[in-house]
A protein has these predicted regions:
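Conserved N-terminal alpha-helix of the aminotransferase class I/II PLP-enzyme fold
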Residues: 14-62, 83
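Short beta-strands and strand-loop turn motifs
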Residues: 24-25, 101-103, 130-135
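Short beta->alpha connector loops at strand-helix junctions that form conserved
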Residues: 81-82, 101-106
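Short, structured coil segments at secondary-structure junctions
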Residues: 95-97
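Active-site phosphate-binding strand-loop segment of PLP-dependent enzymes
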Residues: 110-135
Length: 135
């Protein structure tokens, strides 16, 4: 798996590496999809009601960086949960993007905290300009 260097934390997931066919000849190209991947991107666009869908050639890090750059160019505010991916934090620092953090509620379970949709809705409604939410 690109980005994971063929390693997975759980031994049960080791078999999943055999399912990564993106690098096999004839399986289409993530960089310039024209076959099955292009068809899948078109289907995803239809499913999510978007004009276009493009699968990432650079994994989740590239997708996160792209989303944040687009939001910054549009002057939109970024709201985020506190348990974000490291790539999100790094991109915010590099792009000089301030983040409005949504803090978790205390949990008595095994998780250190939980999030409630109402907290995100309230934060969005308080915005004067459209915002994006990273969860």
């Amino acid at each position: 798996m690109p980005g994971h260097k063929g390693r997975f934390g759980a031994p049960a997931l080791q078999k999943a590496t055999a399912l990564d066919i993106t690098e096999i000849t004839g399986a289409d190209s993530l960089f310039e999809a024209s076959g099955i991947l292009a068809e899948s991107e078109k289907n995803a666009s239809s499913l999510y009601g978007t004009a276009y869908t493009f699968y990432s050639c650079g994994g989740s890090t590239l997708c996160i960086q792209t989303m944040l750059l687009l939001m910054k160019q549009q002057g939109r505010r970024v709201l985020a949960a506190r348990n974000v991916h490291r790539a999100f934090l790094n991109a915010c620092v590099l792009l000089d993007i301030p983040v409005q953090w949504i803090y978790p509620r205390k949990s008595d379970g095994i998780l250190s905290g939980t999030y409630d949709l109402a907290d995100f809705e309230a934060a969005l409604q308080a915005q004067t300009r459209p915002a994006c939410v990273y969860v």
